[in-house]
Amino acid sequence: MRLIPAVDLKSGKAVRLYEGDPARETPYGDPVEAALRFQEEGATLLHLVDLDRALGTGENREAVRRVAASLSIPFQLAGGIRSLEALQEALSLGASRAVVGTVAVKDPGLLARMLEAVGPDRLAVALDARGLEVVVSGWQEAASASALDLLRAWAEMGVRTLLYTDVRRDGTLLGLDREVVARVRAAWPHELIVGGGIASPEDLHLLQALGVDGALIGKALYEGRIRLKEAVWRS
């Protein structure tokens, strides 16, 4: 199982949000320092999120460029990618893969065009949900779509990588909801990356046992609950 450190960008800084709430952020300083530390500890892929772009409050293009220039490992970029132009820009900034969420839920036609433009290896889809209740627009808006129906539709469209985040648990260090993760794993036939609430090595063991392909880890790394070098070795 691949361990993927997450670096969320807000106003050029690395932060973590509690349950996706922009008003409840914990700052963690220079994103380049965080990215380099994770790389040195053995990460083989980094997950970058432009929170300002996702929330419509700005963008962190320069911070992304700085992180990209500092890394020798690949990174994937998420946050506010809601047009073909934004997709191409994300890849031009150096991302090996772009991650889309709101578009995949609200505009399947655009998702199909994105897949056609760059292929399934360079485009992943994010299912952000409170349990299985889907949320969009930077996690600020509930969607009426059924999570399991979306998974079936995306698989049929040719999506090959899914990032599932349980927003209820993101940034909380509360651990995983085993039942929900198991349901997502059972419904998704391709590569599955899971985040939201991972707090301990035991959570990583649970994901491995459920057959999950990758773990998105944020606050647990910043707070020292999980030591990446040791976890990478054990995985």
UniProtKB/Swiss-Prot annotation:
Asked if the record carries the keyword Isomerase, the reply is: yes
Q: Which residues cross the membrane?
A: none
**Superkingdom per UniProt:** Bacteria
State where the protein is found. Answer: Cytoplasm
Q: Which GO terms describe its cellular component?
A: cytoplasm
Stored Pfam families: His_biosynth (PF00977)
Q: Which GO terms describe its molecular function?
A: 1-(5-phosphoribosyl)-5-[(5-phosphoribosylamino)methylideneamino]imidazole-4-carboxamide isomerase activity
**Alphabetic keyword roster:** Amino-acid biosynthesis, Cytoplasm, Histidine biosynthesis, Isomerase
Q: Is the Isomerase keyword given for this protein?
A: yes
Q: Which reaction does it catalyse?
A: 1-(5-phospho-beta-D-ribosyl)-5-[(5-phospho-beta-D-ribosylamino)methylideneamino]imidazole-4-carboxamide = 5-[(5-phospho-1-deoxy-D-ribulos-1-ylimino)methylamino]-1-(5-phospho-beta-D-ribosyl)imidazole-4-carboxamide
Q: Which CDD domains match?
A: HisA (cd04732)
Q: Part of which pathway?
A: Amino-acid biosynthesis; L-histidine biosynthesis; L-histidine from 5-phospho-alpha-D-ribose 1-diphosphate: step 4/9
The residues annotated as the active site are 8 (proton acceptor), 128 (proton donor)
The enzyme's E.C. designation: 5.3.1.16
Q: Which GO BP terms, alphabetically? A: L-histidine biosynthetic process; L-tryptophan biosynthetic process
Q: Which PANTHER family match?
A: 1-(5-PHOSPHORIBOSYL)-5-[(5-PHOSPHORIBOSYLAMINO)METHYLIDENEAMINO] IMIDAZOLE-4-CARBOXAMIDE ISOMERASE
NCBIfam families tied to this protein: 1-(5-phosphoribosyl)-5-[(5-phosphoribosylamino)methylideneamino]imidazole-4-carboxamide isomerase
Q: What is this protein called?
A: 1-(5-phosphoribosyl)-5-[(5-phosphoribosylamino)methylideneamino] imidazole-4-carboxamide isomerase
